[in-house]
Each structure stands twice: as structure tokens, then as C-alpha cells.
Amino acid sequence: MATDGASCEPDFARAPEDAAGAPAEAARKEFDVDTLSKSELRMLLSVMEGELEARDLVIEALRARRKEVFIQERYGRFNLNDPFLALQRDYEAGAGDKEKKPVCTNPLSILEAVMAHCRKMQERMSTQLAAAESRQKKLEMEKLQLQTLEQEHKTLAARLEEERVKNKHVVLMLVKECKQLSGKVIEEAQKVEEALAQLEEEKKRASGLEEELSGEKRRSAEMEAQMEKQLSEFDTEREQLRAKLSREEAHTTDLKGEIDKMKKMTEQLKRGNDSKPSLSLPRKAKDRRWVSVSVGTEGPGTGSVACQTDLGVESTDHVKKLPLTVPAKPAAGSPLVAASAKGSGGATAPLARPGVDRQASHADLIVSSPPTIPPPNTNKIEENGPSTSSGPDTPSSTAPLPSNAAPPAIQTPNAAAQNYPAQAPSTHTVHSPCANAALHPALTPRVQAVRFRFQGNANNDQDQNGNNTQSPPSRDVSPTSRDNLVAKQLARNTVTQALSRFTSPQAGAPPRPGAPPTGEGSTHPPVGRTSLKTPGAARVDRGNPPPIPPKKPGLSQTPSPPHPQLKVLLDSSRASNAGPKVDHKTVALPPTSVPQGNRVINEESLPKSSSPQLPPKPSIDLTVAPAGCAVSALATSQVGAWRAETPGLKPPACSDRPLVIPTTIAFRCPINPVSASSCRPGASDSLLVTASGWSPSLTPLLMSGGPAPLAGRPTLLQQAAAQGNVTLLSMLLNEEGLDINHSCEDGHSALYSAAKNGHTDCVRLLLNAEAQVNAADNDGFTPVCAAAAQGHVKCVELLVAYHANINHAAAEGQTPLYLACKNGNKECIKLLLEAGTDRSVKTRDGWTPVHAAVDTGSVDGLKLLLYHRAPACGDGLDTEASRLGVFDLDEGEANPESTPTPVIPADLINHANREGWTAAHIAASKGFKNCLKILCRHGGLEPERKDKCNRTVHDVATDDCKHLLENWNALKIPLRISVGETQGDNSGPDEFESEHTICALNIRKPTSWDDFSKAVSQALTSHFQAISSDGWWSLEDVTLNSPAEASIGLSATSVLSITLGNVPWSVGQSFTQSPWDFLRKHQAEQVTVLLSGPQEGCLSSVTYASMIPLPVLQNYLRLVEQYHTVIFHGPEGSLQDYIALQLALCMKHRQAAVGFSCDIVRADVDAGFSKEQLVDLFIKSACLIPAKQSPASKKTIIILENLERASLSELLGDFLAPLENRSPESPYTFHKGNGTSECYYFHENCFLVGTIAKACLQGPDLLVQQHFRWVQLRWDGEPMQGLLQRFLRRKVVNKFRGKLPSPGEPVCKMVDWALSVWRQLNSCLSHLGTPEALLGPKCFLSCPVVPGHAQATVKWMSKLWNAVIAPRVQDAILSRASVNRQPGLGQTAAKKHPSPGQQAVVKAALSILLHKAVLHGCPLPRAELDQSMADFKGGSFPLSLVSSYSSCSKKKGENGAWRKVSTSPRKKSGWFFSPTWSKPDLSDEGIKSKTISQPNCNRNASLSRQKCLENDLSLALNLDQRLSLGSDDEADLVKELQSMCSSKSESDISKIADTRDDLRRFDSSRNRPAPSATVTNPRMPVSQKEVSPLSSHQTMERSNRTLKTELGVSRVKSFLPVPRSKITQCSQNTKRSSSSSNTRQIEINNNSKDEIWNLRNNEQIEKPNQ
């Protein structure tokens, strides 16, 4: 069984079956199993099991042997490294025997698997080989670079050695110098030791001298103590003797007063005087108990004064409630009761002496008459003249009262107040006789002089009788002395009243009913505490003049030693935060300089007084006089507004400072105000003169300047000079023995007083009388000093003419120029400068006139000091140039070259006072920005100079001045962007500039390099966003208003390099010097930013030059590199050639950077460019390579420009397949002229770029389209859509030096108009179906940007229209209209010989385009636009083109194409005839007839004019002048023109009204010519100058109005061609109507609104409104 099994076939698959089947058959034949016993069966089973095991062993052995034989035979040639054997080995060892399956039963499949595996391995090895080759190339390149670096290293090492040698030499030199310096140091140390030894000796000597000096001081102190003791004893004895003397003098004075009083009363009774004496002596003695006197020696120098009317305790209460506190004078002057009110009408404040607080009752201080009301015609006797009774209509010598103010029944004393800021204001008690002298209109000079003499003697008597002005007030004031004073004053009042009676006119009127008598019951309302509000304001007092001061400090700031209290009062009066207050309410001060005719308005309402007798207070509205004009003390209480800190002179009453008007003024009646001519400086007539009724001819003789305070002048001459009384002064000057140069105790002469008060006539009289012109007072001030300080120009001019010393310096060093600058009077400054005064004189405090001018903030005075040249200087400024208005601050800053050269040197500008402050310190600390500007404009100013506290001008400056100083020293460097040198001059427009200014950088001293870097980056970012934004945003607003997608892709990273002048710099780089010092040292005039361009393989400079966004250019570059064949096409002027060239340059430099050479070949294609020339070009440029030749590594870029001139199918048709398959397998066979042919194929590295100036392809050229990559540059899409806007905006920024103007500027409007013209023009051409006439933005890039000259843009537009736009439109329309019209002649012949219909369509289209696209929206005014209309071609549409369709309706009415046009079922007839004018057919959309808003006469006239013109036109238009359109293309153009006019998306052409370019509707009736209301002479052609289109806004409004109003009034027919559908239906209506009517009107149908084509509205309706 084993043998049978072993002898079976070696097929292992069938072996088990055969081995099992053979023993089974033998067993069936030999024995039967069923017959076997159990043991046999067991034995048989064991035998079979053994056989099976042996068989399995044999099978496994055979399998192993077979495998080895197979492997050895089939795969013996493979080694152990074979991957298949490894696979088999791994497979056999990987799993068990039972799990193993044969890899493949078929050896072929095993072989195929091995081969596939081998292929994969081969591919992998090839890739690894290629990678190894690339690595080898890189390694070689790195070796080359390493060699170059080694060479550089060698050169650097050599340089380093040279530098080491140089440094070694330098070190040796430094060592030598150090040795020399060390020797010098040793010598200097020895000298220092010697100096120290000498210093010790000097110190010892100084200590000995100090000991001796201390001993001397002790001895002198002892002697002073002894002298003080003796002086105190002498003072005690002197006071006792003085008290005794005063008592005796008072007693004597009382007796004399009683005697004089009795004498005068006797004389009055003898003369028949009806009036009673004012007050008897017993009454005076009876009322003496109400006088309370308190004497204080150490109290403050203020006096509390009050007025009262009733006698009793209640009056005393009023005195306590209503005090008037004023600073007291240093000493007393006039008597207490020397000046009573007029007729006892008002109580005046008594004199308040230093240390005396006195409250006087009305009875003791005022002499009053019995309390009886006088009869109506009785005149009241007053001290200095009569006063008419109160009445509203009675003339009086008071200031004008406004009509709305009730005249109060009170009067103030007639004296002008005078204030002395250098000392405390005085209490006004003394009635000035000079002041009241001018109140009498009929007063003769002789009587006036007598009155002055009498009152002057009375004042002298007062001074002689116990009121010595030079002595201090007595400590022992007895009642007897006061009684004597009262008696003496009563006597003097009686005499004055008696004298006034004979010198006064008789006038009277009954008093106002209900008002208390002025003479007895009325009192002044109490005046509250007054204080200074501003430095230029003084204290407000009553109307009385001050008492005579004992010792005025004159022009000095420091008081005299005998009066120690004055210094305290002086300091208290200098408060700068106080103001004049009247009745506890501040009065607003007018400006410091009151011009002629100004009105000073006082407060309307003031607090009412607690006194029951006071009437309501009126609001005063006075016309006050300017400088030099005195104002009556009845009307005003003048206070000079001298600054508190002003050294020296005290202002007079007639100062040019503001006048403070008290409200407690008594007015008798209103008078006429003073004219402005009577209030000029130095004029003789004044407000008082005019008010008093003097004759103008007497004014110069009687008075000059008005009343002024006497100010304590002891002589009549000084009084007359101070008062300005020319008559009295001339009388006194004629007397013999009078000393005209006599000066009072303070050194003031008559000339000084007249000059100080501004009395020019008095000054002239005194100078003619040979008064001393340079006489100085105790403080060293001369008359010219006083006049200059007060601003009296005429007086200064007179004094200078009489050779006054204009350079005289006072005790403190003040010159007239200094005082004029301190006052801020520019006229005086100019006059003194022209006289040649010295500008460099300094005061004791080190102040110069420049300091004074700056301290007061006088800009004009400072300009004069710095720039005004004296006439003697030769080349000084002329009169006009030196005027203050010429040198303006802003103008000087904008035009530095126009600034005049300063006259004063830098030393004077930088001069420091005692505290170390320069004029710039003062201006900066006070915030006078304009003064600081003028000082900074001086080239020699040193703002870094420090004062004694080590502070600079910037340290003490206010915020505004600090900002000014920082910006003034800042360097304004322009920042410019450069795009580098552009290659290919013919590729881009000429408007592509290489540099553009974007802004100006302000570089200050503290600016760091980090700040500078941030400023440059921010400026670039802001500029890029500004030019790419949609609106005219400012550079500060672009970050907020500019959207992110509007950016053109440029940023700070697009910068290649930055140069500061000529020095290269990069952002973030720092130098040792600050940017301010660095730029000044290198004289950098600009900062230039260079953008990376094609030379660097970037397109940033191309983006900035062309304004095409950077992402778009990068996308174009990607297309060229990817597809190798790209064509750029778009309308003419879309920058196709420029884009292609810049992309080629960028690719060339990119390839050069990698190491490959690249050439650019440009070819300009024209109509004669043949395919053979193109082949030669390809072969020469190595783009076409012979089939047997291997390609080179060089790359080539071919640019074919202007492909639209040739046929693409003919030129490139044979190259399409080779261009797509660039290999030797797809060659191109080129047949030469000699019959030979060669095969070529295109190089893989050849790039073909073409440009076509055509919007779309047509005809056979479409076959070429699918073989190229096309880039369309549409005018209504990016990048062309926003290119023009961005380009023009950048042009405006460059023109305005980096600043964007506001949207309302004319430049912005003209730029927006040019942009809209380009867009509207292309939109209209698109509607016309003429894409070949579309324009790119290139020709609009030359739009001029001329600020202030909008006409230049219109002229440029007219030239562009005539040279470019109009010819293109004409050619496009003719070419379209002649396609089917003249097929035999072609388009060229049709353009040369157009038919009349074509001419009509062309001119109609030009007129429509001109009005709709160009003139529409022009920002020029109507008049200028009318003048510019004649420059545009095609603006006038001639009348000879008007005709009708019916002339050829029979011949061409059956045209099939035209019939197609006329059979539109959606449109109905829009025209039929109406027999009348008054029944318009209104549309369903609500168009209503509106009446014309003008008179009926104008409407009737226009209607009649229209009818006449229509009749004339019907006679003028003959059949020969009509034409018809017979071409279908022409009709289609007409329809497109009509649809364009009625397009709602565009501006409606029907709204372009009032033009003479009529586009006429072709009427359907031959016998009814179309009338036109706009033709003035139908037999003459319409000239182009008559064309007058409106602006867009006016056009829309006017057209909307006339479109609705004409429907019912007048009908203007449109004469443009209409479709055939209208002609047919209109002709049917014509047959039904009479053909002989020439005045029929056409109405609009309800359903024909869209068919209206009226290019212009009726003009005569609007003409009456013009």
C-alpha cells in the first residue's frame, strides 16, 4: 500500500485521493471487512494509521525537495540580496506550515510581480539620483559662494591689517599727546598751589578789615541813637508849637471869614438880590453837633464818607450803612467845604487825610438854601454858575441822555475825576473853578479870567491860612479850627454866587412834578467800595477833582521819604484782579483804546440805594471822546486806565483810556450828541463845548481839550495849562514878569501839565513863548516823556519839532520810547522811531523798550521796534511796506522771503533784565503768542538762554507758547516716494512721475529715532490708504473711513530703501546724533522713500506708478509664468503695453537672480506685419528651435504690441498647435521663398505676451481665443475702474504738498468732474453699441490740477474732446452705420463720404454725448461755461439737418427691415394733433400742468414770440433742407440714442435745457415744418457761441419745471428721428387734419411717455427769469 502510494504521480494535489482509493479497491476484492474479527480489525486499524503517518512524511520530504529544485533551477541567478528571495524567506519564516500559502502557483505571475517591484525600485532610484544631482549643483554653487566669501575675507583681512597699522600710529600719537598734557597738568597744579597761597593771605587781610569795620559800625550806631533821642525831643517841641500856631490861625481865619461874609451879604442886599443867603452862622453853629471827628495816627489810610439830607439820627444811620471807602491821600490839600454841590444839590465826599476817619453831616459840610421850592422862573444861585431847573426839554450843559433813560433830579459836581495809579486815588472834594468855567455859553474871556483869578486867590488863601500842603496833618485838631474853616468857606461861596449871577444867562423852567427840589432835597446816591478789577482800570470816584496833594511822587514808582504810608497804599492799589465798581456792582470796561465815536454803555440796572429821596438811576449811553477830548465832569467821572505796574507818569483826565461813567448823573434835558469830528486828539472843540451851546467859531479861542483836574497846581498858569484854557493861558503869557517855566513842588511846569493832558494848543502857545522844552520834574520826566506815556501824538510831534530830547532818561532810566512802548501807543512809537530815538537804552532794572512792548502785549509796537527803519537809514522800508498791515503773521510764516529784515541786533533781542529775563521770557510767561512769534522770527533769538533761576523760555512758557516754541524750532522735511528709474520710456504714459511728495515731517529737537521711524511708517500707511479711499478723506481720517478692501496692497514693507538727503537709512536704524541734529548737519532737504520694483523682482513701484492694485499685478504675473501665452485686451488707453512690459521686466530680474539669463523682445504690430516677419522674430529670439537642435537654457519673453491692427487668425493661426505642444514631436514646418522648408518647434521657456486695444473680438479672430489665456481690462471693472480716481487723487496730494483738500474745494470738484466724464462717456458709448469707441483712463491721466484755475481743466477737456473723443465717436458711428449701407465701398469709403442721414446721426450723437457726458455736472458757473462751450466740437446742431420722414415714405416705406422696427406691438402712437393749445393730455403717472411762476405779461410775450418764430421757421425750412434716414442701421442707432436719452439709470438728456444745439424731431408732415422757439433768426445758422448749457443741478430743476409747465402753455417739438411706427401713425393723423396749418401743436399721449425724445426744453420760458 505504501508502494502504491509512493508510486503515484508526483501531482501533489491528486496524491491523497489516489493513495486512499487503491487500498480500498484491493480490500474489496480480497476480503470482506465484515468477516474480520475484532482483533483483526484492531490490527488493521493500527497498520493503516502507521501507513498514513509514513505517507505524510514522504509528502513533506517531496515538497521540500521540489521547492529546492524549483528555486535552484528558476532563480539560481539571484543572490541573497534579491528582494524577492528576502520576501520568500520572510514569508516562510513568518507563519506556521499550515498557515502558509504559496505566493503564486504560476511562475509567470511571480515573475511579473518581481518585475513590477523592480520598476518601482528603478523609479525610486532615478528620483534619488535627480535629487543627488540637484544637491551636487547646490554644492557647487555653495562652493562658488564660498570662494567669493574667501576672497572677500582676504580683502577684509588686508583692510583690517591696514586699519591696525593706522590705529597703532594713532595710539602712538595719542601717547605722545598724553605725555605732553601730563606735563602741562603738573605745571598748572603748581600754579594753582601758588594761587591758593595768595588767597589765604588775602583772606587774612580781609578778616582784619572786617574786625575794624565792625568796630566802626558799633560807634556809628551809638551816635545814631543819640541823634534819634535829640530828634524825638525836637519833634515833640515842634508839634506843640505847631498845634498852638494852628489854633491861632484857625481863630484868625474864622474872624476873617465872618467879616468877608458880612461884607458880601451887604453888597448883595444893596444890589437888590431877592435870594436869601445859603445858611446863616447861627444855623451853622447849631448843626455843628452832627460833625464827628476821630483822629488816628497808625490806622489804615482810608476814609469812609457818606452823604445825607435830613438832620437827625436817621441820617446818621444812613451814613453808617452807605459808606464810600477810598484810599486817603498822603496829606490834605484844599479845605473841606471848599467845593459844595451846585445849589447844595449833592453832597460830596470830604477830604480824607491819612490817619483821619471823618464822617460829616450834610449840614456841616454843605451850604444849603432854605427848603422852599423856587418859582418856575427863578434862577438858582450856585457856586460856580447858574443851573437851570430840572425839566425834560430845557437845554442844559450836560452830557447827552438817551431817550429811554428817565432824567434824575440830581446833579453831580462839575469836575472831572483824576486818578493816580502810582499812588492812592484821591477823594474828590474840591470843586474845580476851571472845570465849571466852560459851562457858561455867554461867558466872555475877561470875566472868565476874573473868575479864575478870584478862585485861584481863594485857593492860595486856603493854603496860607493853616492848610500848608507840605506839612503833615496836625494831631491836635480843635473844633475852633473846624468852625473857622466852615465860616471861611461860607464867605467864599457867597462871593462866588454873587459873581456867577452877573456872568450867567437867565434861563429857567418849573421843576419836574413829584421830584424833590434839586437845590435842597436831592443827594448823591451812596457809592460803594471801589476796587481795581483789571490792571488797566482805576478807581471810580465822584465827579469832584482831588485835593492838592502835599508831595506827589511824580513819575517814580517809589514815594518820597516823608510819607511812609503812601507805599502801602501804592502796593494795595496795584492789585490786578480788582475792578471799578459802582454801587457794589462792577462796571464793564470798554477796550483800552476808544476810537472816535465809540459809545460807552454803562450797566442798565444798579442796586437801589437805601436812601428814600433817590430817584431811579438811568442807564447811561454816552458818545465819549477819544484821546485828547475832555468830557464834562457833569456827565462823566473820568479815570485813566493806566496799568498798575506802569512806572512813572500818572494819567490825566483826558487820557485815551476807557472812560468809566457813573450812573448817578443829573440831566436837565437831552442834547444832541457830539459828532465824531469834534472828538479828535488835540482838537479844541469837545463834548462839553458842543453840549453847552458854544459857537464853533469861539471854540478854539475859549477852550481846548475840555475840563481837567487841576491836580494841585499852585499857579494860574499851571491851572490854565492843565485845564487847556487857551484864552486864559494867552492872557497870562502876555503879562510881564510871569515865569512860564515855574514848577510846583513836584517839579511840574506848565508845559509839562499841558503835554501830559494832551492840550496841543496850549503846548504850542508855551513853546512859542520859549518855554523850556526839556524841563524835568523831580523824577526826571520831561514833557515829551509825559506826552509819550499818555499817547498824545500831536504833543509829541510838537515837542520833537522844537528839538526836545527824545533820548532823555528819567531817574529810573525810562525814555520816551520806553514809556510809549509801555503804553502800547503805536503812533507815538512810530513817531519817535522816525525821529531817530535810541532803541537800546535800558532802565535801571535792565528793561529795554522791547521788554516794555512785550510786557504790555503790544504786537504793533513790537513790530515797529523790530522792523521800522528811520528815514535816515537810507535803504529802509518805504511808507507802504512799513505799515503794520503789511507784515502779517500768517503771511510771514507762509512766505518767509517776504519778511522784512529786523533792524535791531540779536544782542538787544536777547538782552536780559535784572532777573535774567529776556523779552521772550516775558512773552512766553504771559501767553503772548503773537509777540513770541515775532521774536522767534528774528534770526538771532536764543530761546535756550536761561535766567537767574536757570529757566529757559520753554520752562516758563504757557501751553500755547510751548507748542509754538516746539513747532518753531522743528524742521519741516518733505517726505517723497520714488519709484526709481522706469525702463521702457514708451511703455507708460508721460504722466507717470518718478517722485511724489506725500507729506512734511516735523522733526523737533526731542524727537528720537524710534519716533522718526514710527512717523515715516505712519505717513506711508496713511498715504497709501488716502489715495486708495473712495472719498476726499484727510490723512487723519483715512484709518477710520477707508475700508480694508480699498487698499492697493502697498504698506511699509514695500519700501526698498530710505535716504535722508544723501545718507541711506532704514526703519529702526539709529545714529549717535538725534534726527534733528543729523538732518541739520547733513543739510537733508528731503526724505526719499524708494519702493521695490521690477529690478528687485517686485511690483510695488509699478503699483504706485500706475495705481493698479498689487494683488492684481501679482495675479497677472502668475498667469504669464503658468500659461506662457497671455494676451491683455481692453479699450484703447487701458495701459496694456505698460502692464506687459513691467511684468516682463519683473520676470527677467527674477530669472537673473536665480542665475538664468532672460531676454525681452518687443515687436510693434501694424497692418503690414506679416507672418513671415513674425517667424523671423521667433527664430532670431530663439523661440523657434530647429527640430534637430537641442533647446538652450536661456529664456525669452516676446511682447507683441497692438495686435488689433492685424488679423489674429492670419498672423497666429499656424502657431496655435506648436504653442500648445512645445516639443520636437509637434514641429512647425516653415516654407521659405526658394521652395525649401524647415521644421521648428517652440522652446519650453519661451513666453509670448500680446496686447490688443480692443474691447472684444469679432469674426474669425474668435477662433484664436481658446488657444490663449486672455486678460480683459474692462473700463467698468477693476483695475481700470478705480485707476483714474486713485491716480488723480495722488496727483492732488502731490500738488498740495502732501495735504488732501476738503471735498468742497474747486480742485476736488474739477477732478471729480473729469472722473465722471470718463465714466459717463463710456456708459453712453456702451448704450450706443459702439465698443470700439470706448476709452481707457490713459488719456484722462493728464488732467491738469491747478488750484484756483478751474478754467484750465475745461480747456484741457475741450482739447481732449476735439482731438481724441469726438473723432473716435464719429468713426465708430460711421463704421457701424456703413456696414450694410455701402458694402461695396467698405467702411473707409463710407467714412470719407457719409450720407446725409449718417451725418445727422453722427452730429446728433456728438451733441448728446457732449451734453450728457461732458458738460453734465461741470462745476463751472453758468457764465464761464457759456464762454467755454464754443471750444467744444459738435456742440452746435445746425438747423439744415431738420427734415421729415415723409419725403421718402413712398419709396422706402415698404422696406422690410424698417417695417420690422415699426411693428412693435408694445408701443403705440405717441403723437396726434390738437386743435388748441389749452388742452394738454396728462399722463396716468400724475404729470400735472403747473403755472409758470412769473408775471402773465412775460408768459403772454413768450407765447406770442414763440408763434412768430414758428411761422418764420416754417417759411425758412424748405424741402431741400430736409433729409431722411433710410438705413436700418441708422434707425437702430436712432433708437439707441433715444433709449440712452430716456435711460433712468443715467442722467436724463431731456433735462439739459436752454441750449442752442437743438436736436430736431423729424416730423411726419412735409407741409408742416417743425417750429422752434429758440431760433432768433431762422435764416442764419446758429453760432456755437450762443450755446449755454446749465450745470447739472440747475438743469435738473429747470427741466423738471419746464417739462410740466410747457404741457399747458407752449409746446416745443423735438426734431430727432423717431422710429417708423410713429411716422406711420403720425402720417395717418396728418391726413385727417388740414395740411395748411403751420401752428398746430402736438400733445403727449398717455401711453407714450417713454417715447419722448426731447433733447432740450423751451428756452424762452426761462429767459424772463434771467
Curated annotation (Swiss-Prot):
Gene3D superfamilies: Ankyrin repeat-containing domain (1.25.40.20)
Extent of Basic and acidic residues compositional bias: 1545-1566, 1648-1666
Annotated Gene Ontology cellular component terms: actin cytoskeleton; cell cortex; dendritic spine; FAR/SIN/STRIPAK complex
InterPro entries in the record: Ankyrin_rpt (IPR002110), Ankyrin_rpt-contain_sf (IPR036770), Cortactin-Actin_Reg (IPR050719), Cortactin-binding_p2_N (IPR019131)
Keyword Repeat appears in the UniProt entry: yes
Positions where Phosphoserine occurs in the chain: S1527
Asymmetric dimethylarginine: residues carrying this PTM: R501
Domain of life: Eukaryota
Bias kind Low complexity: ranges: 385-398, 457-468, 1627-1641
Pfam families in alphabetical order: AAA_lid_NAV1 (PF25408), Ank (PF00023), Ank_2 (PF12796), CortBP2 (PF09727)
Gene Ontology molecular-function annotations: protein phosphatase 2A binding
Subcellular location per the Swiss-Prot or TrEMBL entry: Cytoplasm, Cell cortex; Cell projection, Dendritic spine
Region (Disordered): 1-25, 202-224, 366-411, 457-481, 501-619, 1545-1601, 1620-1666
ANK repeat spans: 712-742, 746-775, 779-808, 812-841, 845-874, 915-945
Predominant subcellular localization, coarse grouping: cytoplasm
Coiled coil: 120-274
Keyword annotations: ANK repeat, Cell projection, Coiled coil, Cytoplasm, Methylation, Phosphoprotein, Repeat, Synapse
SUBUNIT field: Interacts with CTTN/cortactin SH3 domain. Interacts with STRN, STRN4/zinedin and MOB4/phocein; this interactions mediate the association with the STRIPAK core complex and may regulate dendritic spine distribution of the STRIPAK complex in hippocampal neurons. Activation of glutamate receptors weakens the interaction with STRN and STRN4.
PANTHER family: CTTNBP2 N-TERMINAL-LIKE PROTEIN (PTHR23166:SF9), FILAMIN/GPBP-INTERACTING PROTEIN (PTHR23166)
Function: Regulates the dendritic spine distribution of CTTN/cortactin in hippocampal neurons, and thus controls dendritic spinogenesis and dendritic spine maintenance. Associates with the striatin-interacting phosphatase and kinase (STRIPAK) core complex to regulate dendritic spine distribution of the STRIPAK complex in hippocampal neurons.
Official protein name in the record: Cortactin-binding protein 2
Organism: Echinops telfairi (Lesser hedgehog tenrec)
Phylogenetic placement of the source organism: Eukaryota, Metazoa, Chordata, Craniata, Vertebrata
